[in-house]
Structures are given as C-alpha cells and as structure tokens.
Amino acid sequence: MSSNQSYVFYRQELNKTLWEVPDRYQNLTPVGSGAYGSVCSSFDTRTALRIAVKKLSRPFQSIIHAKRTYRELRLLKHMKHENVIGLLDVFSPAKSFEEFNDVYLVTHLMGADLNNIVKCQKLTDDHVQFLIYQILRGLKYIHSAGIIHRDLKPSNLAVNEDCELKILDFGLARHTDEEMTGYVATRWYRAPEIMLNWMHYNQTVDIWSVGCIMAELLTGRTLFPGTDHIDQLKLILRLVGTPEPELLQKISSEAARNYIQSLPYMPKMNFEDVFLGANPQAVDLLEKMLVLDTDKRITAAEALAHSYFAQYHDPDDEPIAEPYDQSFESRELDIEEWKRLTYEEVTCFVPPPLDSEEMES
C-alpha cells in the first residue's frame, strides 16, 4: 500500500459485508469465510492474474485480534518461497491512521487443495514423491526462519493442475480446546506432543503432520482418524508402539505419563505390512517421520536428502529464509499500539517483483 495514494477505491456489498478495494481488483466473487475473515476471488487488471483478497474480520476488536492481525501480516510479508503462500499486496481504504480500521490481504488464488486431489484420484508414487518433496522444501524454509506451522493438513496445502504446491495458513494456528474436540481433521494430523501437551514442542511437530499426510496419499485413507484425543492416542500407539522409558522421562506432564503407563503394552507394527505395496523408500521415510520422540524425528532438511526424493533433491535449490524477528510475540501492548505497528507494516509494503512463471490455478 506504499502507493495507496495512487489507488482509486470502489465499494461493493458482498454477503452483507462492505468491501472497499482498489479498482485494479475487479470481479470480486465470494469464495469462503471463517472466524478471522472472508475471502473473494478477483482479477488483478494490472498483472492479469487471478488473485485472492482476504478482508480481515474485526482486525482490531481486541488485543488478541490486533496482535493476530499484526502476526498474520508480518508472517505473510516475510514469506518469499515457491512452496509457501506469500503476499502480493496489502491495503486499507483509510487515508490516515485515525481512519484505519480495515485490512485487506492479497495472495495468489489457489484452485484446489490436497483434500480435493486425494478424493478425486489415486496418486502414483511419483505424484506422492513430488507433492511431499514440495511440502518439505517449503517447511525447510519456514523452519529456517524459526517459524512452526502447527496446523499442517491437506486443506492447508494448495495444489494447481501442474501438481505445484504451496503451504497456506502457517504459524497462525493456536487452536482452542473446543476446536480440537471430537472427530475433526484439525486433530488427525497433529503430533501427539502438541495434541496432549506432553512437553515443549519443536519444529518436528510439522514433520509428524507430513508423515500423516504422506501415509494418506499412499493409501487413500486417513492414518489416525481418532474420534477424540484418547482414541487418537490409541490409534497412534497401535502403529508406533508403546513409548520407551527414555521418552516417558521426557514427558513433563505427570498425568500424561501415568495415563500412558496404564495402557497395555503395544509393540510397534511392521510398517512394510501396514503400507503393503508402497515403495520401500517411502516406507523407510515414514518410519523416520512417525517417531514419538521429537529428538529422534527427522527434520525437513534431513528428509529432503532422503533417497525417496533422489530425482528431485537439489541442495542448491532448497533455500532458507532471512531471519525473522519474533520478539513482538512476548510484547504486552494495547490495541492502539498493535494497530499502529500494523499500520506501519501496511504503509511500508513493497510488492514483490512479478515472476514470469507466476503460479496460476
């Protein structure tokens, strides 16, 4: 919005929400809405790209909302990688800080997500290699910035017709207990240590999710479709076996330790039997991802070098991110201060250069 002064805005009501956007963005069509905002597809007349415009819902309603708005903008501005959604534009119709109440974010419009792909077709092993390689390539970048996704699942992975993939909605997920309750996909892909508050978690929570997604791509079935937290844990332990004493000692929650010790002993299943007919290298990688002990779980960078990705792995083309300053996370500010920081981020935004091979869906 650094060039906000050159924007001419127009107004349109969509689904009882007033949208006020620059006239370069035409044909606004609602495509979805959630707790944090609503999204329209649109045509960018300057770049001839189909884009997504997200209007944040009540961005400065409370301190929590205001900090989340600032966090989302900071994260999106930082991400500059082929396999991660990035920011094409950010704007507000406000002409001054005093008028500043609405924030609109512009990203690529992604056609389908991995959920659609899995439902529609049986994937070949080559497809699985390429898709999982791209997820890990994006994760290596995100993790190198010190960011954890926390909510990787098929619906957060956008894919176009050429099988090119981008990771969406990262780093924002701080789900409430309510959202994690019952038969919900939000939890099926969650690492046990984060789902059950076992201990301080690290970036490999995302690797557990990739393992769950990869298993689903190979078999066409959800790996751990638990009906609740306890059922989910039982499904996990049935596959990977009862935790070793060494791991139990690392679980800081005494209640969790006692509960696990009360369960009957379960041996680890043979992954080759579970994933019968799958590429042996795929099975080997799954065994390294679906490890209960986070200290022993493979990292994104290590996984990229696994033999399963031999035809795609290129150490010179798996970039890492610039350092990302997250010191704001520990700051205690009021709404006006978060709003001021957000306003500064909006006004100093510089659009990315247009890539000749822009990813369209």
From Swiss-Prot:
ATP binds at residues 31-39, 54. The modification Phosphothreonine is found at residue 181. Serine/threonine kinase which acts as an essential component of the MAP kinase signal transduction pathway. mapk14a is one of the four p38 MAPKs which play an important role in the cascades of cellular responses evoked by extracellular stimuli such as pro-inflammatory cytokines or physical stress leading to direct activation of transcription factors. Accordingly, p38 MAPKs phosphorylate a broad range of proteins and it has been estimated that they may have approximately 200 to 300 substrates each. One of its GO terms (cellular component) is cytoplasm. Keywords: ATP-binding, Kinase, Nucleotide-binding, Phosphoprotein, Serine/threonine-protein kinase, Stress response, Transcription, Transcription regulation, Transferase. One of its GO terms (molecular function) is ATP binding. Residues 25-309 form the Protein kinase domain. Belongs to the protein kinase superfamily. CMGC Ser/Thr protein kinase family. MAP kinase subfamily. This is Mitogen-activated protein kinase 14. It catalyses: L-seryl-[protein] + ATP = O-phospho-L-seryl-[protein] + ADP + H(+); L-threonyl-[protein] + ATP = O-phospho-L-threonyl-[protein] + ADP + H(+). Dually phosphorylated on Thr-181 and Tyr-183, which activates the enzyme. Activated by tyrosine and threonine phosphorylation. Its cofactor is Mg(2+). InterPro entries: Kinase-like_dom_sf, MAP_kinase, MAP_kinase_CS, MAPK14, MAPK_p38-like, Prot_kinase_dom, Protein_kinase_ATP_BS. GO terms for biological process: intracellular signal transduction; p38MAPK cascade; positive regulation of myoblast differentiation; positive regulation of myoblast fusion; positive regulation of myotube differentiation; regulation of transcription by RNA polymerase II. The keyword Transit peptide does not apply. The TXY motif contains the threonine and tyrosine residues whose phosphorylation activates the MAP kinases. PANTHER family: MITOGEN-ACTIVATED PROTEIN KINASE. The modification Phosphotyrosine is found at residue 183. It holds the Pfam family Pkinase. A motif (TXY) lies at residues 181-183. Its EC number is 2.7.11.24. Gene3D superfamilies: Phosphorylase Kinase, domain 1, Transferase(Phosphotransferase) domain 1. It comes from the Eukaryota.
